[in-house]
Amino acid sequence: MTNLIRSNFQDHPFHLVSPSPWPLNTSVCLLNLTTTGALSMHNFNNIHYLYYIALIGLVSAMFLWFRDIISEGTFLGDHTLAVQRGLNLGIILFIVSEALFFLAIFWAFFHSALTPTVELGAQWPPIGIEPVNPFELPLLNTVILLSSGATITYAHHALIKGEREGALYGSIATILLAIIFTGFQGVEYSVSSFTISDGAFGTCFFFSTGFHGIHVIIGTIFLAVALWRIFAYHLTDNHHVGFEGGILYWHFVDVVWLFLYISVYYWGS
Amino acid sequence: MPNSTDNQGSAPPGLSSRPLPSSFDDNADFYNENGFQKVSRRLREEPLIPIGCIATVAAFTGAYRAMRRGDHEQVQRMFRARVAAQAFTVVAMVAGSWYYAADRQKQKELWKLKEQQDAEEKRQKWIRELEVRDAEDKALQERLEKRRKKKAERDSAAGAPDGVAAQAQAAYADAKEKVSSPAGDVAPEDPNKSNITGVRERLPTWLGGSKGADGSSRDKN
């Protein structure tokens, strides 16, 4: 066997990727995004056009990169068990970094809420703030998100049992519930009596719930891609790393909501 | 926030009869508790919530560990456990808030009552201040009137002076009197209350600086 022929067969369980432009492309886009984002927050003229260009560039690079990964995993058969373990490791590193990100947000919240300064009236919620009643819309949202956790668990159950319809309907129900949740959060934001500029309370409230909302949207996209891949027969009952990663991410977002609901909505009001 | 249920039974029947109604008059810890105490009090009040949270996180990490092993059945079980644990936590929270509802409602009313009392006290103080000012003003006017009368009597007794020079002299004396009288001559009715100029100096603070006054009254809360 010549080296040329051998290079077509990888006699090891790992995936040695072919040269790809996306890591470099993504790095450049990310640097542009942070730089132009910081500048536009400091009111530099017209810099937000560059920000949008960087954002479009980043989303396109992600799209094309993920497309490559799907073709490698689904059509080229490069995702062996060892590669799947590596991908799983990547998912958990991502989720851990997200968890620490939310830890910082909770830190900011508890720093202000547990020992409220005299400027806030030495009380939390601060004087003059009318917090959202946790047992109105937020409780409904909690139930909706919890139900979406149940439906996505059903979809996972159906997939590993090889029931295509259950997996599809479970995922569709989850995505619908996620969209309803996001819509209700939008309603809550539009009717809230305070804004993000209303002192430590407004800042912490919209900082935490806003970033959670962004994560819900990302998770919805994650699951929507998985839904399409189930529909397109990409996923099997024992090889569905993307779907399981999406479900794990969804459960993570739901757990974050539980902590948000307890500390920001319930105990913090 | 009430400390525990034991306050519920010993609630006084007539709240307004007490000088400063609070269930925590004899509980200095309530007013001085730090962040850690606040958290631990919450956790002790509703212990099911932290238990549910820990169970939820445990199920979530269990799901990841099973996923790493490739054990999809166990992943499924852990996902179910996660949903169940979270549902338990939410139910515990709703039940807890229902259980403490009366306590918390009472506490809220006490806060409101105290706030109203503070506001009323401030209003009374302001009314007293205005009354003192009014009295000072009236006294001043009275004295001026008296002087004017006395002078008119004196003038008429001495015989009305004629000529422009005499009239000018009279007007000058009058003006001089007006200028010198307010500050020094009026004796304040109440030694605690300042005279007119003192009040005027404070006036901008009273009207514009209500923030400081609010802050100081709220600090006591």
From Swiss-Prot, chain A:
GO biological process: mitochondrial electron transport, cytochrome c to oxygen
The EC number(s) this enzyme carries: 7.1.1.9
Recorded catalytic activity of this chain's protein: 4 Fe(II)-[cytochrome c] + O2 + 8 H(+)(in) = 4 Fe(III)-[cytochrome c] + 2 H2O + 4 H(+)(out)
Entry superkingdom: Eukaryota
Mitochondrial matrix side: 1-22, 74-80, 162-164, 231-248
Subcellular location, record wording: Mitochondrion inner membrane
Segments in the Mitochondrial intermembrane topological domain: 42-48, 115-137, 189-201, 266-269
UniProt topology in membrane: Multi-pass membrane protein
Molecular function per GO: cytochrome-c oxidase activity; ubiquinone binding
PROSITE patterns (alphabetical): COX3 (PS50253)
One CC-aspect GO term: respiratory chain complex IV
InterPro entries: Cyt_c/ubiquinol_Oxase_su3 (IPR024791), Cyt_c_oxase_su3_dom (IPR033945), Cyt_c_oxidase-like_su3 (IPR000298), Cyt_c_oxidase_su3-like_sf (IPR035973), Cyt_c_oxidase_su3_a-hlx (IPR013833)
Record-annotated membrane-spanning stretches: 23-41, 49-73, 81-114, 138-161, 165-188, 202-230, 249-265
SUPFAM superfamilies with a match to the protein in the record: Cytochrome c oxidase subunit III-like
Gene3D superfamilies assigned to the protein according to its UniProt record, in alphabetical order: 1.10.287.70, Cytochrome c oxidase, subunit III, four-helix bundle
Keywords, comma-separated and alphabetical: Membrane, Mitochondrion, Mitochondrion inner membrane, Translocase, Transmembrane, Transmembrane helix
Location (main, coarse): mitochondrion
Physiological role: Component of the cytochrome c oxidase, the last enzyme in the mitochondrial electron transport chain which drives oxidative phosphorylation. The respiratory chain contains 3 multisubunit complexes succinate dehydrogenase (complex II, CII), ubiquinol-cytochrome c oxidoreductase (cytochrome b-c1 complex, complex III, CIII) and cytochrome c oxidase (complex IV, CIV), that cooperate to transfer electrons derived from NADH and succinate to molecular oxygen, creating an electrochemical gradient over the inner membrane that drives transmembrane transport and the ATP synthase.
Subunit details: Component of the cytochrome c oxidase (complex IV, CIV), a multisubunit enzyme composed of 11 subunits. The complex is composed of a catalytic core of 3 subunits Cox1, Cox2 and Cox3, encoded in the mitochondrial DNA, and 8 supernumerary subunits Cox4, Cox5a/Cox5, Cox6, Cox7, Cox8, Cox7a/Cox9, Cox6b/Cox12 and Cox6a/Cox13, which are encoded in the nuclear genome.
Family according to the record: Belongs to the cytochrome c oxidase subunit 3 family.
UniProt-recorded name of the protein: Cytochrome c oxidase subunit 3
Gene name of the encoded protein: cox-3
Curated annotation (Swiss-Prot), chain B:
Topology versus the membrane: Multi-pass membrane protein
Annotated HIG1 domain residues: 20-111
GO cellular component: mitochondrial membrane; mitochondrion
Residue stretches spanning the membrane: 46-68, 83-102
InterPro entries reported for this sequence: Hypoxia_induced_domain, RCF1
Family the entry assigns: Belongs to the RCF1 family.
Subunit structure: Associates with the respiratory chain complex III/complex IV supercomplex.
Protein name according to UniProt: Respiratory supercomplex factor 1, mitochondrial
